[in-house]
Amino acid sequence: MSRLSKEEISERLLELIKDETKPAIGCTEPVAVAFTVATGKKYMAGEVLKIDLKVSKNILKNGKSVTIPNTEVCGLDIAGALGEICGDPEEGLFVFRNVNNEYLDKAKEMIKNKVVTLNPIENTDPVFVEATLKGEQDEVIAILKGGHTNIEKVIVNGKIAFEKDNKNKKDNKDCDFIKELSLKDIRQITEDISIEKLDFIMDGIEMNKEAAKEGLKRQKGLTLGSSLLKLQEEGKIGKDSATIARILTAAGSDLRMGGGMCPIMTSGGSGNQGLCVILPINVVAEDIKAPKERLQRAVFFGHAVNNFVKKYTGKLSAICGCAIAAGIGATAGIAWLLGGKDKEIEGAILNMLANLTGMVCDGAKGSCAIKLSTSASEAVISAYLALNDIIVPNNTGIIGNTVEDTINNLGMLCKDGFYKADDVMLSIACKEVI
């Protein structure tokens, strides 16, 4: 990184955050399946008679139990069928935008007639979908890898029709530059970057606030947000910023996991992570009446820290990235928003890691709202504790000598220690499929 100027590093970080912070409708794992099928169909000359889906186990775990937008059904096979029927690859993460009851009935008929098959595969990228579409004359294979709309290759009748040019496109290795930064570096970029470049941050804040508002009104998912709000109105839980963050984040997740059509701004490629980064920071900003510019920078910082952590833990992994990586991003943003310096920001992160490390991912589903709500609340509390000089000591348990050491420890635990645990969880959560 020494060969790059501060301005170049700042621009690369901004580019990374923009690339990983985009609106989406629905959980991004079913989206990835529908998008892959929709892309493959674009290369078909005639009717699709058969769809064979192969997905990574992580895609399977995180996509099998979430409700497809504008439906009351779950399943990656249904997602694939809808991708063929009404999916438009030009819509990207909005591929489910056109779903309605008529299309859903057609998709159910495809499943009933065994038009769609689904099988998990091992030893591949965590984000991987291969869709083989067969017609009377054509056979198209579309392969998605590394990102929820990242089509790597399309093969038509045995010949490559499209192959991504990785020479002119940043790959995972290029994006790993963020691991060479320190938290202090990221904080400095956050403070120095031109505010005009952060307009997209406000779009995400407004989008996710609206999703939380809709989640409180509609009976979607677990209805945790509205249930917590009722408890608050009855005086059984408080009205402090930590509780408000818990309620709103839960409500947004209720909507997303329950098939709501409201777009949600993602973080690190995940809508739930977008909710968990943005909403707690915004709640605290409203509570302390922070200026708009400071809120924008705090949320940008939160997105950056979330992506920083995920470069160690992986895009999809054995731990709950929504609660841990996004929660760490949120608490960092809150600590900075409150005026914390590097000591307090890093202390807030350490408090979160000492608290929530070990929360496993058992797949995306309605109950994710519980984990998100816990993380949102703890992100607020951890930041306030750090600003009151309550910080877990170094070199205790998962906590290393520095915050960067600790995040590296988290990555080691996730990739080396939890690898078998993830296989066991997959066998439990997906036993009817595997």
From Swiss-Prot:
Coiled coil segments of this chain: none
GO biological process: L-cysteine catabolic process to pyruvate
Molecular-function annotations in GO: L-cysteine desulfhydrase activity
Top-level division of the source organism's lineage: Bacteria
Pfam families, alphabetized: SDH_alpha
Family named by the database record: Belongs to the UPF0597 family.
Protein name (Swiss-Prot/TrEMBL): UPF0597 protein CBO2008/CLC_1955
Origin species: Clostridium botulinum (strain Hall / ATCC 3502 / NCTC 13319 / Type A)
